[in-house]
């Protein structure tokens, strides 16, 4: 349960209609199976102690007596199970019959949550047997104790501060204002839905979307367990489609028409953090609720969930293609607006033959096409210097010509050498002055050409470089519109590959594929034997690690220890723990120390959920101390 990770489960027992004794044993078997998976919150279907399809048998006192006796058996049989358990049953309260979720923990019944919305349309006749529940229905005596009854029950874990559980039943989810809305607003981070939803053609996908959507709206984990095989098939069939969703993502789903157990790991710390970040999610207000405490044994949750090593990149090929097209359009539309607003006659792009400048040129070409402007208005400038290789230079020239942009070449070596003489710098000393002088010379050239051409300079730097501060202040850091500013390096590759894969120009596609195969480098140091000598990832670390760290820090707000924990899962077999720790420390140090560069970024379009614009997503002081984060990293063990 460390870091907010909780194993949860849903299960559908094989019920025997109206045989509560048999059903109690089937339910206990499911509970034991979920316990073997270390589940700490368990959900079983609506009315599963009796079977949902008992119909007029619900009027029989014998059945109701048997149901209550069965609950006692389940409570006693689960006394050693370290979990909060929700199980469905009929319950007599104040002379009426309620359809309730019985909530148990370690053999004790903690509360009964009644169903509010009783369907009486189409195949459903629940109002024939049951009464709608309300917020506070007092207590009912069960097992010699007074047990609270009502929809206003919150079950809060004493030793996992962010684990707060509430329940609703089946139809409650399908109405315009589900009880789960108020539960979430009162602080519930986990919603249990005990359901008996019959199958019809197309209903499964709708149900899936409903559960996922509710978990997204409420920023919660939603555990949905529904009736399955064993229910009466007199008129209906129940498919047992169990679902576990978290903030819009389905983490686990059982096969329909199979009575299966679903297990997933949810992250309640992340959910509460996300709510805290959202100014439109109200502060928890639970004064109308009764809070019931329970405790769970402390143990570290085995992470039974997928952590994507490339969080910015969809793993599904079709989704990736659509996402790439969408991002390219966002970038191009942002630039289109700026071109139209400024009445610019041209756009100036410095082309190195590397990934970032390639993407910037492709986006600029698309923006010009959207405006119906000739691509000759794109002034693509190559500025070979001390570190330029034939490979990158030739690729730059070839792509400029293939795209129909205006080619311009301005070698920088002579100007930089003059600059070294002016400032009395020894050109044989390849230090930061040697490197940054080249970057600033290139920026000056681009700015002046933009003035000549009545245009503006297109920035090429990407999100990963900005996060690490891997840019020369007032050099490549500066432009007049930065189209790549919120595109991480791992995604830049996919955007360029997508453009190549879909291009009708075979020559251009070939150049783009070669750019993709070229090592990432600023090419500010002289080559060795004609090959790139300065490789960025050798200096600052693998971009796939840094992009992962960036996503987990800014999007998820995870602390260093949690990022390290999930990084080990995501990169298992690819990077050693020592390597992950080394570059995690580098990431934090660079992220904090380089904020001054991000505090004065040019405009640029946001394309994803993570961005570092000082006017938008990241309001961070340039002189913040990183010591707390570094200290935590240094306590971590490989």
Locate each region found by the language model.
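Enzyme catalytic cores with a strong preference for nitrogen-chemistry domains
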Residues: 1-350, 366-375, 407
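ATP/NTP-dependent adenylation/nucleotidyl-transfer catalytic domains that generate, transfer
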Residues: 23, 161, 220, 232, ...
